[in-house]
Amino acid sequence: PALGTTQRFAEEAGAALAAPYAEVRTAVRASARLWVDETSWALRGALRWLWAAATPTATLYRLGRRRNRRACELLIGRAYAGVLTTDRWRAYDGHPLDRRQVCWAHLLR
């Protein structure tokens, strides 16, 4: 398809998925426990970061330019009140220690 057609498809898909994405984001941010991780992603030669926040029933994804605390907050919200299970990357250090669990697989490495 032509570039304009591809752009239109992307815009239509984004519009169609806006409400379901918002529902998943709300559910994930309200969860009592989250598993969060990020991984590098090459996008047209530029480094990006794919973030994921998972619960037993839903996973929220966000692709961004940064791998820092602010990027994490954009995913889970600034005031996430539940238990966060993560690796030991410093972006997660701002979460209260009494509500943070380090992933067992990362502890074993």
Regions found by a protein language model. Name each.
Residues 1-109:
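Catalytic center-proximal scaffold of phosphoryl-transfer enzymes
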